[in-house]
């Protein structure tokens, strides 16, 4: 039987032990914010579900998305105001370029979680996810059944991050495609595009690792598919490794964001 860590009686609610744990954790944690700084499509939304659902950390990823244009222009005031009322953040701008450095400066004594994924698997997911809403409208705005045309404002962050890679698809603008499958297949055949995307993805990981090289306690590198994910997060947060875990991995976005989507085991 696992030994229960000591907890102040004021947090001990037998009717809702998870709520008790969350209050205990958020009242006693010895760090400021926590940021998920993995690239998009590495499991950052699943990480958000865990941090919100298990640890009770306040988060709202749309806050960063809403002010991304300001951040791109070097104005962090709205973002800082939003994040002052939250404990965890992922997605834009934390998932982009070197914005983790700005977050580190704005919110000292914070923790950073870098979600990792096999490069080839990441690229496939990246292309599948952004093909319809970002890549196809840029290449061929009048493409067949293009019901996802996005305004230039909403594309700005994607172009700012992936402009060099999109330039490798420039010649496709002069082509006509009968179906989406033809266009997507043509993109997949462009080796330089794939290699450039993967190189940018891997280089960013290296930059993050270098930045935190002398601050190992501030950076956790994980894969969300790791069966020991919660143990590693617990230890990273200064908790006993086995204090809380979930019984099953998060399988799809339909259950994300809800505490009920995580079947947990709690020991205290």
Which residue stretches match the model-derived regions?
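PAPS-dependent sulfotransferase catalytic domain
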Residues: 8-199, 207, 214, 228-240
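Residue-level detector of alpha-helix boundaries and kinks
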Residues: 88, 192-193, 218
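The conserved 3'-phosphoadenosine-5'-phosphosulfate
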Residues: 64-71, 113-124, 143-147, 152, ...
């Amino acid at each position: 039987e696992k030994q229960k860590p000591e907890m102040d009686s004021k947090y001990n609610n037998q009717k809702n032990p998870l709520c008790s744990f969350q209050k205990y954790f958020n009242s006693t944690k010895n760090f400021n914010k926590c940021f998920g700084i993995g690239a998009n499509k590495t499991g950052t939304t699943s990480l958000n579900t865990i941090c919100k659902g298990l640890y009770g950390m306040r988060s709202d990823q749309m806050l960063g998305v809403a002010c991304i244009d300001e951040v791109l222009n070097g104005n962090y005031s709205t973002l800082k105001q939003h994040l002052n009322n939250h404990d965890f953040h992922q997605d834009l701008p934390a998932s982009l370029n070197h914005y983790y450095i700005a977050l580190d400066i704005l919110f000292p004594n914070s923790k950073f979680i870098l979600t990792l994924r096999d490069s080839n698997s990441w690229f496939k997911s990246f292309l599948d996810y952004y093909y319809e809403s970002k890549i196809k409208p840029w290449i061929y705005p009048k493409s067949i059944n293009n019901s996802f045309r996005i305004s230039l404002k909403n594309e700005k962050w994607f172009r700012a991050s992936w402009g060099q890679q999109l330039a490798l698809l420039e010649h496709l603008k002069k082509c006509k495609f009968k179906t989406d499958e033809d266009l997507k297949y043509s993109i997949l055949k462009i080796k330089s595009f794939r290699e450039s995307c993967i190189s940018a993805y891997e280089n960013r990981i290296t930059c993050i690792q270098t930045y935190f090289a002398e601050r190992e306690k501030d950076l956790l590198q994980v894969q969300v598919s790791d069966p020991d994910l919660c143990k590693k997060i617990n230890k990273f947060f200064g908790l006993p490794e086995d204090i809380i875990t979930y019984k099953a991995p998060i399988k799809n976005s339909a259950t994300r964001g809800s505490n009920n989507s995580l079947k947990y085991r709690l020991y205290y």
